[in-house]
C-alpha cells in the first residue's frame, strides 16, 4: 500500500496542499478531480517523491517503485522513439528492446513507430510512447497527470484498456484528470479544492456516483 497522511505544501505564502491524506492498495485506481491550481500535480509530485512536502507522513514499502508521467510528454523531438527510450533506459537497441520492453511497446502499439522521429508523431503516439517508457521501470504505483488530455477517442480507449489490465494484475494507479472516461477504471474518487480534499468517494460503497454529469458537478463545486 502507498499512503500519505496530513501532507501540506506551500510555495512562499501560497498554500498548495493542506492536510491531505489518501492511500491506494494494489489493484486500485484513484482519480483526482479538481480545477487547474487545485493541487493535483503537486500531490502527484509528492507521491513520486520528486517534491518534498512541508509536513506530513509517507507510508511506502521501501522497495516499492512509484513512477510519474507528467502532463507534458518528456520527449526529445529531434530523436527517434527508440532513441528516446534509450535516454531513459540506457543500453544498445538489442538490450533495451528485450522481450519485456517489446511486450510493453506492442501492448501500447508503439512498436510500429520506433524508428520515427518524435517530431513526426501525433499527440496520441507521443503519449503512448511516454507511457511505454514509464512502464519499462516496472512501477508498483503509476502516477498519471492528465494522461488523456487532447487525445482522440481511439487512443483514449487504448490507453484505458492498457491501464485496466495493469490494475487487474495488481498495479496501483492514481490519475489526475478532467476526463470523465478515465473514471470508468477508478475505484475511488477524490475531489480537490484549494489544496484540500473536499470529497472522497469509494465507488464500491457509493455506486450512485456513476454519471458523467455527477463528476462534472464535483469538479466545478
What are these model-derived regions, one by one?
Residues 117-124:
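Conserved ABC ATPase signature
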Residues 2, 17-19:
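Conserved structural motif at the start of ABC-family nucleotide-binding domains
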Residues 33-35:
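The feature captures the beta-strand-to-loop junction immediately N-terminal to the Walker
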Residues 153-155:
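Helix N-cap at the start of a conserved alpha-helix in ABC-type nucleotide-binding domains
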Residues 48:
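Helix-to-loop junction immediately C-terminal to a conserved catalytic motif
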Residues 142-146:
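Catalytic Walker B motif of ABC-type/P-loop ATPase nucleotide-binding domains
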Residues 86, 98-113:
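Conserved ABC ATPase "signature" region
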